[in-house]
Protein backbone atom coordinates (compact mmCIF):
# COMPACT_ATOMS: atom_id res chain seq x y z
CA UNK A 1 0.00 0.00 0.00
CA UNK A 2 1.07 3.56 -0.64
CA UNK A 3 1.36 6.26 1.97
CA UNK A 4 -1.69 8.17 3.18
CA UNK A 5 -1.98 11.94 3.05
CA UNK A 6 -1.12 12.35 6.74
CA UNK A 7 2.03 10.21 6.43
CA UNK A 8 3.19 12.07 3.31
CA UNK A 9 2.67 15.39 5.04
CA UNK A 10 4.51 14.26 8.17
CA UNK A 11 7.51 13.22 6.07
CA UNK A 12 7.45 16.56 4.23
CA UNK A 13 7.17 18.47 7.52
CA UNK A 14 10.24 16.69 8.90
CA UNK A 15 12.15 17.31 5.67
CA UNK A 16 11.35 21.02 5.89
CA UNK A 17 13.39 21.24 9.09
CA UNK A 18 16.52 20.42 7.07
CA UNK A 19 16.16 23.67 5.11
CA UNK A 20 18.00 26.59 6.67
CA UNK A 21 17.84 30.34 6.19
CA UNK A 22 19.33 31.58 2.91
CA UNK A 23 19.58 28.18 1.22
CA UNK A 24 19.11 27.48 -2.48
CA UNK A 25 16.82 24.45 -2.64
CA UNK A 26 15.82 22.01 -5.37
CA UNK A 27 12.82 19.72 -4.88
CA UNK A 28 11.86 16.53 -6.66
CA UNK A 29 8.28 15.60 -7.48
CA UNK A 30 5.84 13.83 -5.16
CA UNK A 31 6.44 14.20 -1.42
CA UNK A 32 9.26 16.76 -1.94
CA UNK A 33 6.78 19.15 -3.56
CA UNK A 34 4.89 19.33 -0.23
CA UNK A 35 7.91 20.61 1.70
CA UNK A 36 7.35 24.37 1.10
CA UNK A 37 3.97 24.09 2.85
CA UNK A 38 5.81 23.47 6.13
CA UNK A 39 8.46 26.18 6.04
CA UNK A 40 8.23 28.98 8.59
CA UNK A 41 6.74 32.18 7.11
CA UNK A 42 9.92 34.14 7.81
CA UNK A 43 12.17 31.56 6.13
CA UNK A 44 14.14 33.23 3.32
CA UNK A 45 15.10 30.57 0.78
CA UNK A 46 15.15 30.35 -3.01
CA UNK A 47 13.72 27.33 -4.81
CA UNK A 48 15.46 26.37 -8.05
CA UNK A 49 14.00 24.29 -10.88
CA UNK A 50 16.00 22.56 -13.59
CA UNK A 51 13.90 24.11 -16.35
CA UNK A 52 15.43 27.49 -15.52
CA UNK A 53 13.84 29.32 -12.59
CA UNK A 54 15.41 30.52 -9.36
CA UNK A 55 12.77 31.87 -7.00
CA UNK A 56 9.76 29.60 -7.37
CA UNK A 57 6.81 30.51 -5.19
CA UNK A 58 3.57 28.83 -4.26
CA UNK A 59 1.12 27.32 -6.73
CA UNK A 60 -1.31 29.83 -8.26
CA UNK A 61 -5.06 29.66 -7.74
CA UNK A 62 -7.08 28.03 -10.49
CA UNK A 63 -7.54 30.48 -13.33
CA UNK A 64 -4.48 32.53 -12.34
CA UNK A 65 -1.88 30.26 -13.94
CA UNK A 66 0.80 31.71 -16.21
CA UNK A 67 1.18 29.36 -19.18
CA UNK A 68 4.86 30.36 -19.42
CA UNK A 69 5.77 29.71 -15.79
CA UNK A 70 6.02 26.19 -14.40
CA UNK A 71 8.32 24.00 -12.36
CA UNK A 72 10.45 21.15 -13.69
CA UNK A 73 7.50 18.75 -13.46
CA UNK A 74 5.37 21.04 -15.63
CA UNK A 75 3.06 22.29 -12.87
CA UNK A 76 2.12 25.99 -12.73
CA UNK A 77 3.95 28.07 -10.12
CA UNK A 78 4.34 31.67 -9.08
CA UNK A 79 7.63 33.54 -8.95
CA UNK A 80 8.73 35.33 -5.78
CA UNK A 81 10.23 38.80 -5.62
CA UNK A 82 13.78 38.68 -6.94
CA UNK A 83 13.24 35.57 -9.08
CA UNK A 84 15.36 35.05 -12.17
CA UNK A 85 14.97 33.05 -15.36
CA UNK A 86 17.61 31.34 -17.50
CA UNK A 87 18.02 28.52 -19.98
CA UNK A 88 18.62 24.90 -19.00
CA UNK A 89 22.32 25.22 -19.81
CA UNK A 90 22.71 27.83 -17.08
CA UNK A 91 20.41 25.86 -14.77
CA UNK A 92 22.53 22.72 -14.98
CA UNK A 93 25.70 24.77 -14.73
CA UNK A 94 24.41 25.98 -11.35
CA UNK A 95 23.74 22.41 -10.28
CA UNK A 96 27.04 20.99 -11.55
CA UNK A 97 28.97 23.86 -9.97
CA UNK A 98 27.57 22.87 -6.57
CA UNK A 99 25.40 25.94 -6.05
CA UNK A 100 22.42 23.94 -4.73
CA UNK A 101 22.59 23.79 -0.94
CA UNK A 102 20.08 20.97 -0.52
CA UNK A 103 17.99 18.77 -2.77
CA UNK A 104 15.06 16.71 -1.52
CA UNK A 105 14.24 13.74 -3.74
CA UNK A 106 12.01 10.69 -3.81
CA UNK A 107 13.48 7.21 -4.21
CA UNK A 108 12.73 3.64 -5.15
CA UNK A 109 15.73 2.26 -3.26
CA UNK A 110 18.62 3.56 -1.16
CA UNK A 111 21.58 1.36 -0.25
CA UNK A 112 23.56 1.41 3.00
CA UNK A 113 26.38 3.03 1.02
CA UNK A 114 24.12 5.95 0.09
CA UNK A 115 23.50 4.79 -3.48
CA UNK A 116 20.28 6.17 -4.94
CA UNK A 117 17.89 4.49 -7.39
CA UNK A 118 14.91 6.67 -8.22
CA UNK A 119 14.23 6.69 -11.92
CA UNK A 120 13.58 3.27 -13.47
CA UNK A 121 11.39 0.30 -12.66
CA UNK A 122 12.16 -2.56 -15.08
CA UNK A 123 9.31 -3.16 -17.49
CA UNK A 124 7.77 0.30 -17.08
CA UNK A 125 8.09 3.17 -19.51
CA UNK A 126 9.72 6.27 -18.07
CA UNK A 127 10.66 9.56 -19.77
CA UNK A 128 14.24 9.43 -18.49
CA UNK A 129 16.38 10.27 -15.49
CA UNK A 130 15.86 14.02 -15.71
CA UNK A 131 18.06 16.20 -13.52
CA UNK A 132 18.21 13.82 -10.57
CA UNK A 133 21.63 12.45 -11.56
CA UNK A 134 23.31 15.86 -11.40
CA UNK A 135 21.42 16.92 -8.30
CA UNK A 136 22.29 13.74 -6.42
CA UNK A 137 25.98 14.11 -7.29
CA UNK A 138 26.47 17.84 -6.87
CA UNK A 139 24.04 19.21 -4.26
CA UNK A 140 25.74 19.94 -0.95
CA UNK A 141 23.16 17.83 0.89
CA UNK A 142 20.89 15.09 -0.49
CA UNK A 143 17.77 14.22 1.49
CA UNK A 144 15.55 11.33 0.38
CA UNK A 145 11.87 11.20 1.34
CA UNK A 146 9.97 7.99 0.64
CA UNK A 147 7.93 5.11 2.04
CA UNK A 148 9.96 2.62 4.07
CA UNK A 149 8.73 -0.31 1.95
CA UNK A 150 7.37 -0.67 -1.58
CA UNK A 151 3.77 -1.54 -2.46
CA UNK A 152 4.53 -5.23 -1.97
CA UNK A 153 5.98 -4.65 1.48
CA UNK A 154 9.60 -5.11 0.41
CA UNK A 155 12.28 -2.95 2.07
CA UNK A 156 13.45 0.06 0.09
CA UNK A 157 16.44 0.54 2.39
CA UNK A 158 18.79 -2.20 1.28
CA UNK A 159 22.34 -3.47 1.54
CA UNK A 160 22.68 -3.01 -2.21
CA UNK A 161 20.35 -1.45 -4.79
CA UNK A 162 18.93 -3.91 -7.31
CA UNK A 163 17.42 -1.20 -9.51
CA UNK A 164 19.49 0.95 -11.91
CA UNK A 165 21.32 3.69 -10.02
CA UNK A 166 20.76 7.39 -10.33
CA UNK A 167 24.00 8.14 -8.49
CA UNK A 168 26.37 6.30 -6.15
CA UNK A 169 27.23 7.23 -2.57
CA UNK A 170 25.24 10.45 -2.63
CA UNK A 171 22.48 10.23 0.00
CA UNK A 172 23.02 11.97 3.34
CA UNK A 173 19.65 11.60 5.06
CA UNK A 174 16.53 9.46 4.59
CA UNK A 175 13.09 10.29 5.98
CA UNK A 176 10.32 7.69 5.84
CA UNK A 177 7.02 7.23 7.66
CA UNK A 178 8.91 4.94 10.06
CA UNK A 179 12.20 6.65 10.78
CA UNK A 180 14.88 9.22 10.07
CA UNK A 181 18.24 7.68 9.16
CA UNK A 182 21.64 9.03 8.21
CA UNK A 183 24.10 7.28 5.91
CA UNK A 184 27.65 7.10 7.19
CA UNK A 185 30.55 4.70 6.63
CA UNK A 186 28.40 2.24 4.70
CA UNK A 187 25.76 1.95 7.39
CA UNK A 188 22.31 3.31 8.10
CA UNK A 189 22.25 5.21 11.37
CA UNK A 190 18.86 5.44 13.06
CA UNK A 191 18.41 8.97 14.41
CA UNK A 192 14.65 9.27 15.03
CA UNK A 193 11.51 7.16 15.07
CA UNK A 194 8.34 8.35 13.33
CA UNK A 195 4.64 7.60 13.87
CA UNK A 196 5.18 5.55 17.00
CA UNK A 197 7.43 3.05 15.23
CA UNK A 198 9.81 0.93 17.27
CA UNK A 199 13.47 0.08 16.76
CA UNK A 200 12.53 -3.55 16.20
CA UNK A 201 10.01 -2.59 13.51
CA UNK A 202 12.45 -0.36 11.65
CA UNK A 203 15.15 -3.02 11.85
CA UNK A 204 12.77 -5.69 10.53
CA UNK A 205 11.70 -3.50 7.60
CA UNK A 206 15.26 -2.54 6.64
CA UNK A 207 17.32 -4.93 4.53
CA UNK A 208 20.68 -3.80 5.85
CA UNK A 209 22.58 -3.28 9.08
CA UNK A 210 21.40 -0.39 11.23
CA UNK A 211 23.39 1.41 13.88
CA UNK A 212 21.39 3.27 16.51
CA UNK A 213 22.23 6.81 17.59
CA UNK A 214 19.20 8.10 19.46
CA UNK A 215 18.65 9.62 22.90
CA UNK A 216 18.15 6.89 25.50
CA UNK A 217 18.77 4.17 22.86
From Swiss-Prot:
Keywords: Transferase. Gene3D superfamilies: Glutaconate Coenzyme A-transferase. One of its GO terms (molecular function) is CoA-transferase activity. Its EC number is 2.8.3.-. Transmembrane segments: none annotated. InterPro entries: 3-oxoacid_CoA-transf_B, CoA_trans_fam_I, NagB/RpiA_transferase-like. Belongs to the 3-oxoacid CoA-transferase subunit B family. Heterodimer of a subunit alpha and a subunit beta. This is Probable coenzyme A transferase subunit beta. It comes from Bacillus subtilis (strain 168).
Amino acid sequence: MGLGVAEREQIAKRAATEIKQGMIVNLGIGIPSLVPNFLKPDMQVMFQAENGVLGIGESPEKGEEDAHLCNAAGYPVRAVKGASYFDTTMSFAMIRKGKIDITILGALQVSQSGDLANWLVPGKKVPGMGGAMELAQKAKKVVVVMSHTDQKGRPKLTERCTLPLTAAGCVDLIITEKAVLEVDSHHFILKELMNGSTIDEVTRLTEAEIKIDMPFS
